[in-house]
A protein has these predicted regions:
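Non-catalytic C-terminal accessory region of glycerolipid acyltransferases
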Residues: 1-3, 44-46, 69-70, 104-230
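Membrane-anchoring hydrophobic helices of lipid-metabolizing enzymes
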Residues: 1-54, 86-87, 91, 97
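Short, functional N-terminal and low-complexity linear motifs
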Residues: 7-10, 29-31, 54-60, 75-78, ...
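A short linear-motif detector with a strong N-terminal bias
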Residues: 12, 30-31, 53-54, 79-80, ...
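Generic structural "secondary-structure junction" signal
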Residues: 18-21, 33-36, 59-64, 82, ...
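Residues in well-ordered beta-strands of folded domains
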Residues: 35, 76, 175-177
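Short amphipathic alpha-helical segments and helix-helix/interface helices
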Residues: 37-41, 64-65, 89-90, 110-111, ...
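Catalytic core of membrane glycerolipid acyltransferases/transacylases, capturing the structured
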Residues: 46-105, 127-136, 140
């Protein structure tokens, strides 16, 4: 599995430079499977905005940009520590036609966008240190970003989890899951944790099916839970 994981990292890395071309190409040329689009439209029809969520799975950049071709999209991004790499990736994302919102200062813009019925794409599967909420991932408590669930609860926007994985013929398979509807208040830690656990469960399900596609090099369980949660 490790060998296949590194092979997949190389293939996706090679496709990064082609991101704008892939996004603007006819869908059937890029995607062998495009499944669950009705879930995106159903979520948007609720009029509360949509949080499109994925993990570091397959070509997650292509997932966000392709959804941006389907409906107006902003991507909440964390700037890279390397300025040169950050500028290169930002240029690729801009050429793909999506709006970029930086994490931190961009949160207010994200809330405004969702409350206006807009769409937001983000990642939610890396170690969030002490700022995260602890939910189980492969049976172990993992510090998980609270942002997706918090935004959903604060605005009423459903979460639509999706993935963009390599197909056997070299193209990609995009799949969207039914919307996760927010239940509770953004100020309720229990509600944030419960919704985070729900979308993390979807991620785990996909990773179990396609383990080579997830970014295993990240130290997902780096932050230990506090004693009262362990």
């Amino acid at each position: 599995m490790l060998r296949e994981h590194y092979r997949e990292l190389g293939r996706v890395g090679a496709d990064y430079a082609r991101l704008p071309r892939l996004v603007h190409a006819p869908r059937e040329r890029v995607f062998a499977c495009w499944e669950g689009e009705e879930h995106a439209h159903a979520a948007r029809a609720r009029g509360r905005g949509v949080v499109f969520l994925t993990g570091h799975l397959g070509h997650f950049e292509l997932y966000g940009a392709a959804m941006g071709r389907l409906m107006p999209m902003a991507i909440l991004v964390k700037p890279l520590s390397n300025p040169g790499a950050d500028a290169w990736l930002r240029a690729l994302r801009n050429a793909s036609g999506v709006e970029l919102l930086p994490t931190g200062a961009g949160v207010r813009g994200a809330v405004r966008r969702l409350r206006a019925g807009g769409c937001l794409a983000m990642l939610g599967d890396q170690d969030a240190r002490r700022d995260g909420v602890f939910v189980r991932f492969f049976g172990r408590l993992a510090s998980t970003p609270a942002g997706p669930a918090w935004l959903s609860l604060a605005t009423g926007a459903p979460i639509v989890f999706g993935s963009c994985l390599r197909a056997p013929d070299g193209r990609y398979e995009a799949r969207l899951h039914p919307p996760l509807l927010p239940e509770g208040d953004a100020g309720d830690t229990g509600a944030v944790r419960a919704l985070t656990a729900r979308h993390t469960e979807l991620l785990e399900r996909v990773v179990r099916e396609r383990p080579e596609s997830w970014f295993w090099l990240h130290k997902r369980w780096k932050t230990a839970p506090p004693p009262e949660e362990a």
